[in-house]
Amino acid sequence: MSNISTDLQDVEKIIVLDYGSQYNQLISRRIREIGVFSELKSHKISAAEVREVNPVGIILSGGPNSVYEDGSFDIDPEIFELGIPILGICYGMQLLTHKLGGKVVPAGDAGNREYGQSTLTHTPSALFESTPDEQTVLMSHGDAVTEIPADFVRTGTSADCPYAAIENPDKHIYGIQFHPEVRHSVYGNDILRNFALNICKAKGDWSMDNFIDMQIKKIRKTVGDKRVLLGLSGGVDSSVVGVLLQKAIGDQLICIFVDHGLLRKGEADQVMDMLGGKFGLNIVKADAAKRFLDKLAGVSDPEQKRKIIGNEFVYVFDDEASKLKDVKFLAQGTLYTDVIESGTDTAQTIKSHHNVGGLPEDMQFELIEPLNTLYKDEVRALGTELGMPDHIVWRQPFPGPGLAIRVMGEITEEKLETVRESDAILREEIAKAGLDRDIWQYFTVNTGVRSVGVMGDGRTYDYTIAIRAITSIDGMTADFAKIPWEVLQKISVRIVNEVDHVNRIVYDITSKPPATVEWE
């Protein structure tokens, strides 16, 4: 299996070197909001490799390391000699200070560790153009810079940090001790915009319209006269991929809709009617519910579920592809967040993603992932740009493994039915309350926990259903949605009264992090 992903070599970009910060993906996202493409790169990247990528700017992210410790994340010093503007954030500022001859002291030695919001006072600088001389920023550091490198000047201070911002304007190297990428830094977006547009001289013309043109050319060049298989789940991601591919290669696209028995209520019919009917996609429906459920029988481990579903999904594709000629490619709706969440060299794997892990090495296809550089909100914007209606573009996200990862423990038909019916009620009531565009994602989970209840005059011992609803911008971080109590109460009453084998409803009030969006 080979992987053909989005080629962005010719796109003007700013790269973010990943030093393990919990915020490093947000840096990339904020730069994109400015209209400049941005992506994460390993901190191990060499100067020669940076030259090949040809970015207009480089950002060194924050991170948990200390520059004076053995094994701390480093940087190729030749990167500083490439003539490319550089912005170091938090650990990134400490690292560039350390490498260029300044001094960084351990936490506490200088008595100036800072955690939380602080007031930054700055002097004139291209980085702070059109921002107030005093502004609120988020600090999160223990170590501190006490001496700056030669040819650098101090441009910002705070009450506990004498070197909150430094720069070498001649070499276009900048360092800031605070985090401009988070909303707590009130003028953070303006600072990043100054770096991207004024210092790096980026044009700011990254858009979904440009992305469509670029992707269509790339897809046509890659595919040639061969045929492409796409797995349709009915979700936003695969639907957008389908419309994009059809626009690029027309009848060369064959969509396979695998009904694995793990779909939401009425979803199979909706997929066939919506994408096969309205958009005219060539869809082959594979009824494989028994095949999947037999393989999943007795399996409780979430990672094993994902691997089984990933394998079986592709094997079904193999079966369908064997009936066709000139099928060379398999398309997937993998997003940038999927790739990040499956682990980098600075972070442990949280969980394998269904579009990243679980694919057998002997699969017959080459993999095409047209969306694997995009965040979720960018995919929705892409769908709108492609002419897709809101009810498709804003459809609730649904994972490839389907309800298998919304049923805790072993999967049974009874558990699946409780999730299907409760989820349908949740979606209906959220829409009635006018909250369906305000809440980023919402669904129900069979927790696998049974509890005692009373219905009528009888004792019950039935399942507990959890409601998960979150607000987010890009899926990298999320807060639980503050759904009005009266709406939650109505949902709870309906589920308990209308769904068999359920007698208790709980609401998940955990943010991401520490939790992920899905329960498994």
From Swiss-Prot:
Pathway: Purine metabolism; GMP biosynthesis; GMP from XMP (L-Gln route): step 1/1. ATP binds at residues 233-239. The keyword Signal does not apply. Homodimer. Residues 206-395 form the GMPS ATP-PPase domain. Gene3D superfamilies: 3.30.300.10, 3.40.50.880, HUPs. This is GMP synthase [glutamine-hydrolyzing]. Its EC number is 6.3.5.2. GO terms for cellular component: cytosol. The active site is at residues 90, 179, 181. Catalyzes the synthesis of GMP from XMP. InterPro entries: Class_I_gatase-like (IPR029062), GATASE (IPR017926), GMP_synth_C (IPR001674), GMP_synth_GATase (IPR004739), GMP_synthase (IPR022955), GMPS_ATP_PPase_dom (IPR025777), NAD/GMP_synthase (IPR022310), Rossmann-like_a/b/a_fold (IPR014729). It catalyses: XMP + L-glutamine + ATP + H2O = GMP + L-glutamate + AMP + diphosphate + 2 H(+). CDD domains: GATase1_GMP_Synthase, GMP_synthase_C. One of its GO terms (molecular function) is GMP synthase activity. Residues 13-205 form the Glutamine amidotransferase type-1 domain. The gene is guaA. Keywords: ATP-binding, Glutamine amidotransferase, GMP biosynthesis, Ligase, Nucleotide-binding, Purine biosynthesis.
